[in-house]
Amino acid sequence: MAETLSGLGDSGAAGAAALSSASSETGTRRLSDLRVIDLRAELRKRNVDSSGNKSVLMERLKKAIEDEGGNPDEIEITSEGNKKTSKRSSKGRKPEEEGVEDNGLEENSGDGQEDVETSLENLQDIDIMDISVLDEAEIDNGSVADCVEDDDADNLQESLSDSRELVEGEMKELPEQLQEHAIEDKETINNLDTSSSDFTILQEIEEPSLEPENEKILDILGETCKSEPVKEESSELEQPFAQDTSSVGPDRKLAEEEDLFDSAHPEEGDLDLASESTAHAQSSKADSLLAVVKREPAEQPGDGERTDCEPVGLEPAVEQSSAASELAEASSEELAEAPTEAPSPEARDSKEDGRKFDFDACNEVPPAPKESSTSEGADQKMSSPEDDSDTKRLSKEEKGRSSCGRNFWVSGLSSTTRATDLKNLFSKYGKVVGAKVVTNARSPGARCYGFVTMSTAEEATKCINHLHKTELHGKMISVEKAKNEPVGKKTSDKRDSDGKKEKSSNSDRSANLKRDDKCDRKDDAKKGDDGSGEKSKDQDDQKPGPSERSRATKSGSRGTERTVVMDKSKGVPVISVKTSGSKERASKSLDRKSASREKRSVVSFDKVKEPRKSRDSESHRVRERSEREQRMQAQWEREERERLEIARERLAFQRQRLERERMERERLERERMHVEHERRREQERIHREREELRRQQELRYEQERRPAVRRPYDLDRRDDAYWPEAKRAALDERYHSDFNRQDRFHDFDHRDRGRYPDHSVDRREGSRSMMGEREGQHYPERHGGPERHGRDSRDGWGGYGSDKRMSEGRGLPPPPRRDWGDHGRREDDRAWQGTADGGMMDRDHKRWQGGERSMSGHSGPGHMMNRGGMSGRGSFAPGGASRGHPIPHGGMQGGFGGQSRGSRPSDARFTRRY
């Protein structure tokens, strides 16, 4: 089996010539014809690194041969050594592969990478890799499992001894007719012990009894091949860096895979199909035999496996072959139950082609070690065809029964669960032969399932009873027995996803292919003697399929046909030997499988696409909805911005309008204030002018009334105390008389002016007196009382003093005090009756003060205009009239100036001049 696996990954054209004569003869082969196993063996002989893919190995070997001085194109290879090295290399790589599979995707070994690359090349045309083994725990029950290096000869010997013991025990149970073959197989096992490190025993076994044994082993290999590829392919799918199937540890894997196949596990079936096609396409049957031999030691250490591992030795191979035939039968039944699920035709064709080519090589190409052993096996099989078929059936039934109940599925695993976890968990209730964690390679993210094989059905039942519905790594796991009946149905129960169908179909396909392989091998062995391969093949095409297996097993050598076919995956010629029954059955099953396979693949593809489409449509709807919402949001924001802008503009316009109105109001208020101010100022001016005019009129009137007395007379009267009674009567009469009388000055005699001396009046003092009076008039509230009092007293006393002096000097009678004071008070009252604004009066006062300096005589009690007001003795100065005050001219033009001068002494400030 290991050889089969190695052939799957590694054998090229050299696969056809893999079987050489059993003798350890040396033959020259081209470097390009060497398989990876051979390349590695040659490299190990030369102590050169044997890791890497085929191209790297070829380059390394070529360089090593050139260094030795040899011809790299013609390499001498000892057939025995070749076979041994191939086996050993496969065995040596098995631990590596085990390590890779144990760790799942966690580890990548260099050898695994090369082997995976080669195996992937072989599998590139096969699309039936539905099941991928995520993780596989190789059971360390046997020493073979413990072998991590190629040189663990001790472990191999132990395993071989175990296998020998097993074979002996089985021999006792086998029919006597098989005893001969068993003995021969025993000898073969002894040979295996002697050369345990190399596993080249198959080539050394040349007894005729080997033929039937080889045939049976090939049949078993068909099964194991299929089951092992399950592992292998899964590892390839899951771990691109895993080693090639050829490098897969054949011993342990084969044991596990066989068990898995016995349980007709759908997942294995899937994997089996994929790897099986490649294995058969590229490996010879001798490889298969070798693999079986290797594998049996592996399985035997696994206690419970021994029944399944009967083919361990070539003798066990006899029993195993019968078991394989039975397995093929079971697989055919399974196939019938799950007809919809069929393996890809390519896989089977390649497998059949591989068989044909191998057997042709066995019969026709003696130089290859594989071929020689195969031909020998064919001869042996011819010797006892019917016995072989019977023994096959028996062993297969026993094996099926024994392995049927030992396998169980573990579903609901956590994504972190590894095969070693399962092994540790179930080892509490018995010996765990194999444990795998598999998933559906077609649907990423599919759930993981565990497939566990116990050593006995009782232990499996115990595990199911104790561990069903228990918790592992935080997940509830369910443990269910793996049934042989409908493989596809079991997987469907296990999985709701497409992976179920694919797995079951793969298992069916693998079963059918294995059965076909068995029948083909048997028939080939029988036909090897007859040599009528082609005819039987034609007949086989015409035969129906249901009873083909039994018919094929019975008609041992009668209906085989050898056909050389080009392997599709590698383009290598492969010899396929088929019996008529096996071929037709294979063709029918292949058609059925291919149809179901296509159907399933289509369905699975549609199913895979449906959720994707729904997700895409949902995401598209969500995206459209979000875009629509974004557009609506953007539109709403835009409208909102426009509304806000309009509102802002309206507010700004209203603010501007209010500002304009406010400014207009302020302007109107200013104008009103200005007009009011002008009006008040005009009123004040009019008041002042009227007051001045009145004062002047009073002065004139008084001077008119005053008798034109000579100065001596005045001087005489000076002692009369100002004629109080007479003066008072006159003043009373005057002040109470009508002031509006326009002719009151007409009787004034201008000639009297000459009597009064002209007093030169200081302009500044006159204006100062005017200022003083005006200040008194303009601030009645603040100092009206004191000012009036001062003015009254000044006027009175000034008049008194001046009159007194005048009377003293000139005889003028002093004017009475009272009338001037009273008149000043009355005039003050009259002048400021309408005044309201003190500040404005102050300003106006100042303005009048500066601007009316030309009328210096307006505000004093007796001051007349000093500047330009009088022209000589002419009429009243135009300064007064120019301001719009009507002043009578008639009668005044004589002594007006003198009159004013005469009255000026009434001011106290001028008394010092006299």
Swiss-Prot record:
GO cellular component annotations of the record: nucleus
Keyword Nucleus: yes
UniProt source species: Pongo abelii (Sumatran orangutan)
Protein name: Scaffold attachment factor B1
Location in chain, cross-link Glycyl lysine isopeptide (Lys-Gly) (interchain with G-Cter in SUMO): K231, K294
Gly residues: compositionally biased ranges: 891-900
Superkingdom assignment: Eukaryota
Positions of the UniProt region annotated as Interaction with SAFB2: 599-914
Modified sites of kind Asymmetric dimethylarginine: R867, R873, R883
Disulfide pattern: none
Region annotation Interaction with POLR2A: where it falls in the sequence: 528-791
Chain positions with N6-acetyllysine modification: K607
Subcellular localization(s) per the UniProt record: Nucleus
Listed Low complexity bias regions: 1-24, 319-330
GO molecular function, one term: chromatin binding
